[in-house]
Design a protein with these regions (language model features):
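Residue-level hotspots at or immediately adjacent to binding/recognition sites across diverse folds
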Residues: 2, 49-364
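N-terminal secretory signal peptides that target proteins for export/translocation
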Residues: 1-26
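Bacterial N-terminal signal peptides
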Residues: 29-46
Length: 364
């Protein structure tokens, strides 16, 4: 029998949840879960590692020839470079459109859940123990900026967003919202800017063109800001299940939110009203969780999920095509190279594909 799940409210009061929001399982069990790879796997208790003999010594990720094949949870473009992050503190990068990958030296063995670049050189990665890492050379080297191992027993940050090389936000478990205006030299706990008394997990943050910032999370929670995150409005969303991702589009005010069981919603008024987007597979309604995605340079949108699902839209999310990759490996995030080929990450590491998500290319 599992222990009751307790959560601190913003007032500091301990509150028992009616239903456990997340449970800790083995990494394999979480990979195979129907929930989002990004949000569920990020709560896996990190694998035990041998403690450094000197408690003050920095513990680096272990070099591995298979780092690009390990569980990876997010990927982003740093100029023409591709950078991906994931399990055991692995960060890998490629300068040849994903043909070959180099493992970066990273000062952690904690699971890294997300990353974002403010420009070609300045990037941030977040993960367990409320960890934030930063790079100033496009992902070649990394340094720790922030960590809070005492925060909710090492609960993770789940997403990070940067406007430029100075202004950014990190969001995560138990309502975590942290802000910086100096490139991460200082991080401010900005959770009290949100009306989130139950401390729902915040799973994703994005910018919506011409409108502002948007955050989604547990229990269908939604928040928007029109003033660069200084103040936030709580919205009544279209769905009471967990939302794992949110994307702006090339169309001003248009935003997509997605999560469990293939649920995908579109708004053209910055989240005031929503329309469900029906996506069908050859066997009927898409029933796999959707976990991550990206607005690509050409204005198209890609969303990925469990079971190798790859959704693609060229009309700002009004309609989507769907393919289920033959390997059926769960996917957590995606981007594209300069030729328009999709580069997917998740179970099995990096998958370089055609623009539709098919025709995997071998890694080296």
């Amino acid at each position: 029998m599992s222990e009751p799940v307790m959560r601190r409210t913003q007032s500091g009061e301990a509150k028992q949840l009616r239903t456990p929001a997340f449970r800790f399982h083995s990494p394999l069990a979480n990979v195979l879960s129907l929930c989002s790879v990004l949000s569920v796997l990020s709560f896996v208790a990190p694998l035990q590692v041998h403690a450094a003999t000197d408690a003050s010594a920095t513990v680096y990720s272990i070099p591995s020839a298979k780092a690009a094949d390990s569980l990876l949870l997010d990927i982003d473009n740093a100029g023409k470079r591709l950078v991906a992050v994931g399990d055991r503190g692995h960060i890998v990068y490629s300068d040849d459109e994903g043909k070959t990958w180099t493992q970066a030296k990273v000062p952690t063995r904690m699971m890294l859940t997300a990353l974002a670049f403010g420009d070609d050189k300045h990037g941030w990665a977040v993960g367990h123990d409320a960890l934030i890492l930063a790079t100033e050379d496009g992902g070649t080297t990394w340094a720790q900026q922030f960590s809070d191992q005492e925060r909710e027993e090492g609960a993770p940050f789940l997403d990070v967003w940067f406007k430029d090389d100075s202004t950014g936000f990190a969001v995560g478990a138990y309502g975590a919202l942290f802000a910086t205006t100096d490139g991460g030299k200082n991080w401010e706990d900005a959770g009290d800017r949100l009306d989130n008394p139950d401390g729902y997990h915040l799973n994703a943050i994005t910018e919506v063109k011409g409108s502002g910032l948007f955050v989604v999370g547990e229990m269908g929670s939604m928040f928007r800001s029109s003033d660069d995150g200084e103040t936030w409005e709580t919205l009544k969303g279209p769905y009471e299940g967990s939302l794992f991702g949110v994307l702006g589009t090339a169309e001003p005010g248009t935003v997509l939110a997605y999560g469990l069981r293939g649920n995908l919603f579109r708004s053209t008024d910055f989240g005031t009203t929503w329309t469900p987007i029906k996506v069908k597979s050859p066997r009927g309604k898409l029933d796999f969780g959707l976990s991550g995605g990206a607005l690509l340079k050409d204005g198209s949108i890609v969303i990925v999920g469990h079971g190798g699902s790859v959704l693609k839209s060229t009309d700002n999310g009004l309609t989507f095509t769907l393919i289920n990759r033959p390997d059926r490996l769960s996917l957590s995030s995606a981007t594209a190279d300069d030729k328009g080929n999709l580069v997917l990450v998740g179970q099995g590491g990096v998958h370089v594909t055609s623009p539709t998500g098919e025709d995997a290319s071998p890694k080296q």
